[in-house]
Regions:
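A donor-sugar binding/catalytic signature common to diverse glycosyltransferases
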Residues: 273-316
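A nucleotide-sugar donor-handling region in carbohydrate enzymes
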Residues: 152-217
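A short, charged/proline- and glycine-enriched loop
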Residues: 2-11, 53, 194-202, 457
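Active-site and donor-binding regions of nucleotide-sugar-utilizing enzymes
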Residues: 9-34, 47-48, 52-57, 61-177
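Nucleotide-activated donor-binding/catalytic signature segment of Leloir-type glycosyltransferases, i.e.
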Residues: 252-274
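Conserved active-site histidine-acidic residue motif and adjacent donor-binding/catalytic loop
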Residues: 84-87, 270-278
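C-terminal amphipathic helix plus adjacent low-complexity
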Residues: 334-457
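Conserved catalytic-core segment of nucleotide-activated headgroup transferases in glycan assembly
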Residues: 23, 189-256
Length: 457
């Protein structure tokens, strides 16, 4: 009689930045069943269940935003193994190791390159992992471009009901298969429900590239300083994404740390780093332009403000929050305003579990469909080859450039001379790499702004 033998799922996550590693690793845990069974020939029945953990192997794609040791520690997500790889090295690894699930936590072009590279690497292979991809947070720009670059994965995760509807509309609109779109929620929501603190704490969640100009970033810092001086009884925190010299998902040309050096900061205003969840534990009012932290805050029912001072514009991303009830200005906050979020809007975003009478937006069940789809695909046996929408036929003037940036040919094979590491880099090479990254970040944060200002003269 066939019996079920439980085993741990083997999951691989490829990420290209600190936030995408966090999203990818937590998503892997959310969508992987706590128990996976495979059929074996046995005359005995076992009542044992599988270990609730998964075997998680992390791969960090080498590039400008490869997270530092400090950033990885701050995220706090543990993996059974974690190492830095080139694209070609990762593809080679995927032909050697057998995984059940592969999560591609990359920018759109990286996902597309890996889909074509994996399709080539797995040619003639009877089995392959379930391939999953998605977005780290709010999708407010380049919707069609980013989605079509992610097409071809078995599951394309949408972080809300609203996103799922938009994703399907894009795929169906170009004649692509939309069955991969799967509604979930952001995997890092959670934490204790909001309770008032003493002292009252205001947190401004800074973003690396929103707003972009020195004028706008200086304005926001000035208003934060003014708010702290106007309310000396409040603790005011400027929550920063990274320390000088580090990079995140988005390039930060004008760090707030640098701008703050020109201010005489009041005693009740501090610059802080650390895990956002831990900062939210002591937050009474979360203020941002369009950070995903707003959704984390709303999920915990913390009063949340999305600023309108610089306008409500697609370039800022705060247009995503139209209808949320959270839009307000610094003038309103200075006067003591606390917005009340719209329950229906919040439910459509997949946050604030159980906040509606219908139960929509329940976080506890948000990943159920994805888990079921992964389990179903794992039990089907041989999966079909990966078939992205973009091919040398559908996008002959676009796809080759996307793949070439990752040293892949139009058919997904490695280009001659593609960088690949067969062994761990020695101390000298590690120093050279760190120096190269430091030079790049220096150019982004110091040289580029100077050149831009000279061009404006």
């Amino acid at each position: 009689m066939p019996a079920s033998t439980a085993r741990r799922l083997r999951v691989a996550v490829l990420a290209d930045s600190d936030t995408r590693w966090k999203w990818g690793a937590l998503t892997a845990a959310r969508i992987s069943s706590t128990e996976f069974t495979e059929t074996t020939e046995s005359t005995e029945k076992s009542d044992k269940t599988a270990d609730s953990d998964i075997r998680l192997d992390g791969f960090l794609l080498r590039g400008r935003a490869t997270p530092t040791v400090r950033q990885l520690k701050e995220i706090g997500v543990r993996a059974d193994s974690l190492r830095e790889v080139t694209a070609v090295e990762f593809l080679r690894e995927m032909t050697k190791e057998t995984y059940d699930v592969l999560v591609l936590a990359l920018v759109g072009g990286g996902v597309q390159a890996m889909l074509h590279g994996l399709a080539h690497a797995w040619q003639g292979r009877p089995e392959r992992p379930v391939v999953v991809t998605g977005y780290v947070g709010v999708v407010y720009e380049k919707l069609a471009d980013g989605l079509l670059l992610r097409h071809g994965a078995d599951l394309v995760l949408a972080n809300s009901r609203q996103d799922a509807e938009r994703f399907r509309a894009v795929y169906e609109g170009v004649g692509a298969d939309a069955s991969s779109v799967t509604e979930v929620a952001l995997p890092f929501l959670g934490g204790a429900p909001y309770e008032k603190k003493d002292p009252y704490t205001v947190v401004f969640a800074a973003q690396p590239s929103v707003p972009e100009t020195r004028k706008d970033r200086s304005y926001l810092l000035d208003r934060l300083v003014r708010h702290a001086r106007r309310h000396p009884e409040r603790e005011v925190l400027l929550k920063l994404r990274s320390k000088p010299g580090e990079h995140t998902t988005h390039i930060e040309e004008l760090p707030y740390q640098k701008l703050a050096q020109r201010h005489d900061l009041p005693a009740n205003l501090r610059l802080v780093y650390g895990n956002m969840g831990e900062v939210l534990d002591r937050t009474d009012l979360l203020v941002t332009v369009s950070s995903t932290a707003a959704l984390e805050s709303l999920h915990r029912r913390i009063p949340t403000v999305v600023l309108t001072d610089l306008g409500v514009r697609e370039a800022l991303g705060n247009h995503h929050f139209v209808g949320s009830g959270c839009l307000a200005s610094w003038d309103q906050l200075d006067a003591g305003h606390e917005p009340t979020p719209d329950a229906e809007w919040v439910a459509r975003q997949g946050v604030a579990a159980g906040s509606t009478p219908s139960g929509e937006g329940s976080y506890a069940t948000a990943f159920g469909e994805a888990r079921e789809r992964v389990a179903e695909l794992l039990t089907t046996g041989e999966l079909p080859p990966l078939k992205p929408y973009y091919t040398p036929v559908t996008a002959p003037g676009y796809l080759p450039g996307v793949l070439a940036r990752h040293h892949l040919a139009p058919d997904g094979s490695p280009l001659p001379g593609a960088p690949v590491a067969d062994k761990a880099p020695g101390p000298v090479r590690q120093i050279v790499r760190r120096a190269a990254r430091g030079a790049y970040r220096h150019g982004v944060q110091r040289v580029a702004p100077v050149i831009r200002r000279m061009g404006e003269l």
